[in-house]
């Protein structure tokens, strides 16, 4: 049955018309996952040069650009009786004052104080009766700087589309570019509960007809359908094998609603040098650094890491070029082993690189993407139950998300963005996660931890710094493996 469903989705996923105001199955799942102490918003803490703009001036700059992201004036409307996925509707009471906020750091205005502020902001759940985002302007940062803290619900945006959205708020030159004028915004009347329910029931009734039209297309293109079916079967088997429970760890404990936030700065050129000297990719280097830091942290807290291999969920974007700039989530993921047992930094990186290479060939991400698309066809009650079941099962120990950002300076109202640190949500019984983002030659780590379960989060941040230094020092002495000879030997063995 499982294989049949995945196969059907593979060949029909482009056949059914999508209501652009209806949340996708994955976006809906993020709302279902937001229960108890688990908040499902993403964010970032940014540091800018120069004095902060006046609040009214800053708010005006945001107001002038809102027509470019109309979703930011919409709220989630749930379907009565759970008869459909939620939809986006205009908020007739939209008030920019509520979403764009202003605060000041107390003297001396240290970066530590900014991180504390960001953690407190991140600890509060977004109000679902309003558009799901907040933007905090924090002035008074030392050395003539100011901060910006963003908070947006995961149902609205993913990491890659967030970078596209930044182009709406930021300029690529110090001199602000002219903003195209938008029409005066008049919200559509909010639909009644009966209207929302009726629309959802009509969509559910017409969906079988849409699928039937997709089935007819299989008859017209049997070869393409056969290829898709083979890929789906392969991906389904790989994903099933990856779904085994992750090992127990001190990071998988009950959490509360409050958060801590720590950051680490790294140099992109240094990480590139490491991967050039040892092999692999920059993402492999990042995962090896996380594995080394986590292993050192656990040993420092008295835990044995002998033979311990944790599992990280590594989100990847499946957003196409045509979808860049669109809001909503287009992500899949790998379940990547973290060799925290390994004391040798070079062996650790090569182990990560080899396993990630195997995962990419295994089509695990394809299987996860297909199951994600299953939620677009499944009844909403099943989607909600599946999301809650996933939150109860320990499929991974922590999240490590690495988002490539722009490699040239960005500006906000003429002020240069100096650094950005991502903030990733904690799922149920997930006490820590790693968000990594590259920007303008930097690679910055944002560590989010549960306030009670991770009282030593800053220590884990120092372990990340140590793991980078350890790997950087060892890399020049490493002998890069000869891939061509290995590939030739592999081909000879097949002959």
Task: Describe these PLM feature segments.
Residues 2-26, 34-39, 43-430, 434-465, ...:
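Soluble acyl-CoA-dependent acyltransferase catalytic core bearing the H(X)4D motif
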């Amino acid at each position: 049955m499982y294989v049949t469903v995945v196969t059907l989705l593979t060949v029909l996923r482009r056949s059914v018309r999508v209501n652009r105001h209806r949340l996708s199955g994955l976006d809906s799942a993020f709302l279902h996952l937001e229960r108890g102490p688990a908040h499902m918003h993403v964010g970032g803490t940014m540091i800018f040069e120069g004095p902060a703009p006046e609040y009214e001036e800053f708010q005006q700059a945001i107001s002038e650009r809102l027509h470019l992201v109309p979703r930011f004036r919409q709220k989630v409307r749930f379907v009565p009786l759970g008869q459909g996925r939620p939809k986006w509707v205009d908020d007739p009471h939209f008030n920019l004052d509520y979403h764009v906020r202003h605060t000041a750091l107390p003297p001396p205005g240290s970066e530590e104080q900014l991180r504390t502020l960001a953690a407190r902001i991140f600890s509060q759940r977004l109000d679902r009766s309003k558009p799901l985002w907040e933007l905090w302007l924090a002035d008074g940062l030392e050395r003539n700087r100011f901060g910006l803290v963003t908070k947006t619900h995961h149902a609205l945006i993913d990491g890659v589309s967030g970078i596209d959205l930044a182009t709406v708020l930021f300029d690529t030159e110090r001199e602000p570019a002219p903003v195209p004028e938008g029409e005066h915004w008049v919200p559509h009347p909010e639909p009644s509960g009966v209207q929302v329910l009726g629309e959802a029931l009509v969509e559910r009734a017409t969906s079988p007809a849409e699928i039937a039209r997709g089935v007819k297309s299989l008859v017209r293109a049997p070869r393409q359908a056969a290829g898709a079916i083979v890929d789906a079967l392969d991906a389904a088997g790989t994903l099933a094998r990856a779904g085994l429970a992750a090992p127990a760890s001190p990071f998988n404990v009950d959490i509360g609603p409050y958060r801590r936030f720590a950051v680490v700065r790294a140099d992109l050129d240094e990480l590139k040098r490491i991967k050039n000297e040892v092999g692999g990719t920059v993402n492999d280097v990042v995962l090896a650094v996380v594995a080394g830091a986590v292993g050192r942290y656990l040993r420092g807290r008295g835990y044995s890491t002998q033979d311990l291999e944790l599992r990280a969920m590594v989100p990847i974007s499946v957003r196409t070029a045509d979808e860049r700039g669109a809001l909503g989530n287009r992500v899949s993921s790998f379940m990547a082993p973290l060799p925290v047992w390994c004391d040798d930094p070079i062996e650790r990186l090569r182990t990560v690189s080899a396993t990630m290479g195997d995962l990419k060939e295994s089509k695990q991400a394809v299987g996860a993407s297909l199951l994600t698309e299953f939620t677009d066809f499944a009844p909403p009650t099943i989607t909600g139950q599946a999301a809650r079941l996933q939150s109860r099962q320990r499929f991974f120990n922590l999240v490590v998300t690495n988002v490539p950002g722009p490699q040239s300076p960005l500006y906000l109202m003429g002020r240069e963005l100096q650094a950005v640190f991502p903030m990733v949500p904690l799922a149920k019984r997930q006490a820590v996660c790693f968000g990594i983002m590259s920007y303008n030659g930097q690679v910055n780590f944002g560590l989010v931890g549960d306030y009670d379960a991770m009282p030593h989060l800053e220590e884990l941040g120092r372990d990340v710094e140590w793991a980078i230094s350890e790997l950087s020092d060892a890399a020049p002495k490493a002998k890069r493996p000869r891939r061509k000879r290995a590939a030739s030997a592999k081909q000879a063995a097949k002959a």
